[in-house]
Amino acid sequence: MSETAYTPRLRAEYDQSIRSKLTEEFGYANVMQVPRLDKVVLNMGVGEAVNDRKKAEQAAADLGLIAGQKPIITFSRMAISTFKLRENQPIGCKVTLRKAKMYEFIDRLITVALPRVRDFRGLNPKSFDGRGNYSLGIKEHIIFPEIDFDKMGETWGMDITVCTTAKTDDEARALLTAFNFPFRQ
């Protein structure tokens, strides 16, 4: 019995059309020079977790539903008295997505989640870091269809960082635009 490997829609699109389009646009000599998606990091900072550890666990459970992968709870590295924060207290959670889960998450983000954001006018084109990575913030995590609005207690924001192998911001912008990221004009 032959086993067929599952290929996400965006990965197949990258292999079939996006890679050749970027090669023409930037004139790469080698296929390995063409920028590609490396990883996606989802981070949820939960300030209320300082007083109540269950908040960090609830946020981690929600992030696990969104990502389809178990997140890790992040802890403070030093004590800050103005925030009533001690060392090694839970302050949030994060998860790193790679390969198929990364492509599936980006597909859901672009096609389902971002259109559900209130007053969405496009992504900020200035949020590149100078090395080909893109970061965006989301104010409410309830835009993802995996979160049940009725059972949810609180809304948290989250940071999404898309890491690419691009050397410059222009290459990364061309790559993400080819993946249909809705940048503002």
Swiss-Prot record:
Alphabetical keyword list: Ribonucleoprotein, Ribosomal protein, RNA-binding, rRNA-binding, tRNA-binding
UniProt xrefs under InterPro entries: Ribosomal_uL5, Ribosomal_uL5_bac-type, Ribosomal_uL5_C, Ribosomal_uL5_CS, Ribosomal_uL5_dom_sf, Ribosomal_uL5_N
GO cellular component, one term: ribonucleoprotein complex
GO biological process assignments: translation
Molecular function GO labels: rRNA binding; structural constituent of ribosome; tRNA binding
PROSITE patterns: RIBOSOMAL_L5
One Pfam family recorded for the sequence: Ribosomal_L5
Subunit record text: Part of the 50S ribosomal subunit; part of the 5S rRNA/L5/L18/L25 subcomplex. Contacts the 5S rRNA and the P site tRNA. Forms a bridge to the 30S subunit in the 70S ribosome.
Family membership noted in the UniProt record: Belongs to the universal ribosomal protein uL5 family.
NCBIfam families linked: PRK00010.1
Record function comment: This is one of the proteins that bind and probably mediate the attachment of the 5S RNA into the large ribosomal subunit, where it forms part of the central protuberance. In the 70S ribosome it contacts protein S13 of the 30S subunit (bridge B1b), connecting the 2 subunits; this bridge is implicated in subunit movement. Contacts the P site tRNA; the 5S rRNA and some of its associated proteins might help stabilize positioning of ribosome-bound tRNAs.
Protein's recorded name: Large ribosomal subunit protein uL5
Gene: rplE
